[in-house]
Amino acid sequence: MFNMNINSPVRFVKETNRAKSPTRQSPGAAGYDLYSAYDYTIPPGERQLIKTDISMSMPKFCYGRIAPRSGLSLKGIDIGGGVIDEDYRGNIGVILINNGKCTFNVNTGDRIAQLIYQRIYYPELEEVQSLDSTDRGAQGFGSTGLR
């Protein structure tokens, strides 16, 4: 069903000379680091759209998932949103959320997030009157416990 050549390159454009190419930091890294093209200041409890000045063409049957970097997560920096659709061709922006207690500064060229390519499935949706039952049912949000 998925006829995708995993060795095909993903095409990207540097929109300005401030943009840096996405990079993997090790051969086994799942994500490609994304870099800020500008300086930003994010006060505690605030969020900021960080521009990369990179646009790219996602592989067929894939989307890009923008994920946090573990080092930034330790500082209370998280990601908002985080999906790059297969047909999006604009400047890739990353929403950084400062959950920390101190102002967070982003400098031009800082690694701000990682881009992970994931396969996507486009099912047909069918509205029905009821769903088959399961042992769990509609129990959610902590219903399975911690252990």
Curated annotation (Swiss-Prot):
Task: Detail which positions bind Mg(2+).
Answer: R24
Has UniProt tagged this entry with the keyword RNA-binding?
Answer: no
Provide any one GO MF term from the record: magnesium ion binding
Q: What is its EC number?
A: 3.6.1.23
Give UniProt keywords alphabetically: Early protein, Hydrolase, Magnesium, Metal-binding, Nucleotide metabolism
Under the heading Gene3D superfamilies, the entry gives: 2.70.40.10
Name the InterPro entries for this protein: dUTPase (IPR008181), dUTPase-like (IPR029054), dUTPase-like_sf (IPR036157), dUTPase_trimeric (IPR033704)
One BP annotation, GO: dUTP catabolic process
Q: Which residues bind dUTP?
A: P68, R69, S70, G82, V83, I84, D85, Y88, G93, I95, R111
Summarizing the function annotation, the protein's role is: This enzyme is involved in nucleotide metabolism: it produces dUMP, the immediate precursor of thymidine nucleotides and it decreases the intracellular concentration of dUTP so that uracil cannot be incorporated into DNA.
Q: What is this protein called?
A: Deoxyuridine 5'-triphosphate nucleotidohydrolase
Native species: Cowpox virus (strain GRI-90 / Grishak)
What phylogenetic lineage does the species belong to? Answer: Viruses, Varidnaviria, Bamfordvirae, Nucleocytoviricota, Pokkesviricetes
Gene behind this protein: OPG046
